[in-house]
């Protein structure tokens, strides 16, 4: 075997092993994977029935904050799971996102209402402040902070 061929046979596996360990030791950087804990922003919006105002000061303790809409097909798929969580004692706050109030109420009457409280965010301002990119999205909130 020629000298060059012997060197290549040695260099290629060593290089591949080195590359493997370099890639293994680097941090994976995926878009959206940089999660940060942040406080629920200040807001004052009406409930879905339009009878009361809800602010961030009304939301206490631990809960799931679920962004949903009646026009959202994926929300319909997720909805039975939320109902199971609610039936098992998990507190869920709904954030109705860019939705017509009457459509949202009809949707809940048809498919069940798993929410302890529903915020009507018709313009999407609170959702925007939370960094929502679409529905559904669900946040775990612990003492006023999204974790």
Predicted regions located by residue number:
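Hydrophobic beta-strand anchors of alpha/beta hydrolase catalytic cores
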Residues: 64-65, 92, 138
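N-terminal targeting signals for export/organelle localization
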Residues: 1-44
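Thiol/disulfide oxidoreductase modules built on the thioredoxin-like
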Residues: 6, 110-114, 121-147
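Short active-site neighborhood of thiol/selenol oxidoreductases, capturing the structured segment around
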Residues: 53-76
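Conserved SAM/SAH-binding loop
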Residues: 45-51, 122-124
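Structural microenvironment flanking redox-active thiols in thiol-disulfide oxidoreductases
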Residues: 76-112, 122-128
């Amino acid at each position: 075997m020629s000298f060059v061929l012997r060197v290549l046979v040695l260099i290629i596996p060593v290089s591949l092993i080195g590359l493997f360990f370099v890639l293994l030791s680097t941090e994976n950087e995926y878009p959206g994977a940089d999660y940060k804990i942040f406080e629920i922003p200040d807001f004052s919006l009406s409930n879905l029935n339009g009878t009361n105002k809800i602010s961030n000061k009304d939301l206490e303790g631990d809960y799931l904050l679920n962004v949903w809409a009646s026009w959202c097909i994926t929300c319909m798929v997720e909805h039975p799971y939320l109902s199971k969580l609610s039936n098992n004692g998990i507190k869920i706050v709904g954030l109705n996102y860019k939705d017509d109030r009457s459509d949202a109420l009809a949707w809940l009457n048809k498919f069940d209402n798993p929410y302890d409280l529903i915020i009507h965010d018709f313009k999407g301002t609170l959702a925007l402040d939370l960094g929502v990119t679409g529905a559904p999205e669900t946040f775990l909130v612990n003492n006023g902070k999204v974790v």
